[in-house]
Amino acid sequence: MIRSHWRAITLLTLIVVLANAIILSGTFNCDPEILFSGLAVAPQRSFTDACFVDPAVGFLTQALGHLSAQDWLHGIIPWWNPYTGIGMPLAAEVQNESFFLPFVLLLHFHNGWIVQRLLFQIFSGLLTYAFLFLLKLGRPAALLGGALFSLNGTFILTAGTVAGTFLFLPLLLIGIERAHQAALARRPMGWSLIALAIAGSLYAGFPEIAYFDGLLAASWTLLRLAQTPATARWHLLAKIVTGALLGIVLTAPMLIPFLQYLQLGDLGLHGILMAKEISPIAATPLQMLPMFYGALASYSAIAFAWFQIGGWFGCAPVLLALYAVVPKPGAPHRAERTLLACWIVILEARCFGLPGVTALLNLIPGVASTDIIRYAPLSVEFAVFVLAAFGFDDLSRCGPATRGRLAWCAAAFFVCLGLSVIPAWHLLPGWYRTYPALRLPALLSLGGITLTLAATALSLRTGRHLRATQALIITGGVLLFLTSQLGGLRSGHIDRAGIAYLQTNAGLTRFYTLGPFNSNYPAEYRIAAINAVQLPTPENWSNVYNTKLLTPPQSFAYGSTIFMQTAAVRANIAAFEALGVKFIGIPLGGPPLNRILLSTPPPVSVPTTGARGNNYLQMQPGQSVTGTITAPARPASTIYAAAITLGTFKGRSSGPLAISLCAGGQCATGQSDLTLATDNAAFTIRLTPPLPIQPGTALTYRITHAAGPAVALWLSTAQTPMLALQVSATTDQPIRVLHSPAMLIYQLPNPAPYAQASLDACNLVILNRQFMQSNCPQPATLLRRELFYPGWRARVNGTPAAIQPVSGIFQQIPLPAGPATIRFTYMPAHTRLSCAAALLACLIWLLCALAARRHRA
């Protein structure tokens, strides 16, 4: 069977490899670590802004996936992650692919994510081809559908864990079709692929996409049940239910810890804003015209729109899909076409906020708490591409379209195009004035789309040149995929000095970052860091992190500034030390930890001729900003520098930026060239001479951009410049221990040990995070600074010891008098039962598959 399809298999594989040619050749560097870790040195971008939109490919896939792979390769089941937060579940977080064997083992290699994406793309294309061929579409149409799905935009926007679920949607539908055929023929089995697809989609690590794929599969199942004769209907239902139940039981070792984690975790905005969230207006054109703004995956003003669309279809597939929706009389699969069209319309209406649709879909359990506008579009893309394959197959089999059908296609297409483009049309003039370099790629893209549409329309009208049209559509998908890789770096490298320093000196203490060596990346190098970017997050830890460490309280420091969080660290040094934090990293140019920063109130005056956005003030040459600040009631000190958060429009700003400060009749000035500034970061200007201030002194400042291209002053939520004055410290403060090309590392004076006994007379030896030895003159207690979470067990001299919470987040056990050996282990609840159930389900699956094979023989 496979031999007869070797050409299609080869073509689909080559299409995927060609679509990744730039990244495979190393021409541009799309390594997520250099893009997202904050450790890049001298990075130079190429033509566009980014290879991806969602940094989860770095934080989750590359960083935590590598940790999981390392655990497996060392014979450790990756249940627990001691290197993020103060420890938290690893496999239960699911998005890191911990149990997605064997694919997760590829993440042992630094560039394993590339191999993963290639495999996921190839399998997605091949399985879509197989599904369409199973529906009796011709091979050219099946090839077109498989190629389109293997090149879908979601692979670009979210290249990490999300991509692993893609291949299981066509596999699940193949399983349903085989079950349907087996029920009609009264054959046993037929459900094996259903179990495999459901288990794979859950183990792949993204339950939200698996959920919407499951809803589409459930709709397909209802259609097949309605089409099945009554005598075979119960057989079909039994097969599908059997496959679904076995698939769920196969995932029990991961699913049960995940469900427990949902109950004990902080889900952030899920279930609050997700129920009413809709795609922004700027996103409306991107599904049909992904190059509408001249670049893919942009980190500019429209980045949020890219983050909120999930993927795209393109114009030619939409035209073919519309052609398939109204087939000729007697055309096959009319009901299937209607189902897919309804699925597309309903989910598109929900994503873009059509009144009533949101409330209706939220009645379905689970929909209101999922990020539907990002994770439902994959199933919509699949539906569009399947319909496009139907349309192409109609052309191949039935010849050219009638005038009436062609008129319908043209009218419906231009309605869809208008609904996509018109809402965002007003954004274009300002966009291309700000980014004139993007006009050329936008025009080239428009030319390519026009050519492909013309070829498709010609084929619809004449029924000829189908191979050329097919080749043009696939070529357009390949070129679009290659375009995203132009967002890689032409040069630059990762600063590993800080990593090496922490690996040598951190031991069992922890690290905290205000920017560089970003969240979860320390875990890749087995360095414990309290920053965490994952969902869910243990609620007891999240409450402490969000309310006691950050200023103002907020999740993951989103929306805060480096100044605010540096001030929070200074104000809460004792709290950080109590968590075992010894080292803190800040970006170059950021406010130093051993200085106190004074923020400014609203400015006295601002330029009236500069452009003003919601978050920035654009200063033209010769303009100034003035304002006042009052020194706090504290001992006299000296201001020696000012830090201003600037936007340089990707390094285009230049010329001198000056600041003057006056207090008590004395003034100090400073000036620096904007070519030294980092875009969207603090720009420090030293004052000459330093300005002494007294408590309560009124300070007047003036920021002047004398000459050169415009520069943007970032504004706070109060619409004030993000200005901070660095004041010499008068108290014991952190010591700077490393100045590397990418970050500064400070050491806190008194970090708490990882574990300590309640009696000073106890002799405690900490061998590692799980094994310790103690010798106490009398009974005592042991405080272990690891997250208190169900599943932890302790044994003292081989005897179980009860673990009690301390401060809601740490662990405490009793210690006996005399020598004791202490061991901590973690295993989620019901693990033995869930593993036994999964093994039994696997055995049943294998035995039934063998029995069915013998029956066929």
Language-model segment annotations:
Residues 12, 122-135, 139-226, 239-259, ...:
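Membrane-embedded helix bundles of polyisoprenyl
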Residues 144, 162, 168, 179-184, ...:
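Contiguous transmembrane helix-bundle modules in multi-pass membrane proteins
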Residues 23-135, 140-170, 276-307:
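Active-site lumenal/periplasmic loops and adjacent helix-entry segments of GT-C-fold
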Residues 2-89, 259-265, 488-525, 531:
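Hydrophobic alpha-helical membrane-insertion signals
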Residues 276, 434-441, 445, 466, ...:
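Extracytoplasmic
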Residues 39-71, 76, 243-327, 358, ...:
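Periplasmic/ER-lumenal interhelical loops and adjacent helix-loop junctions
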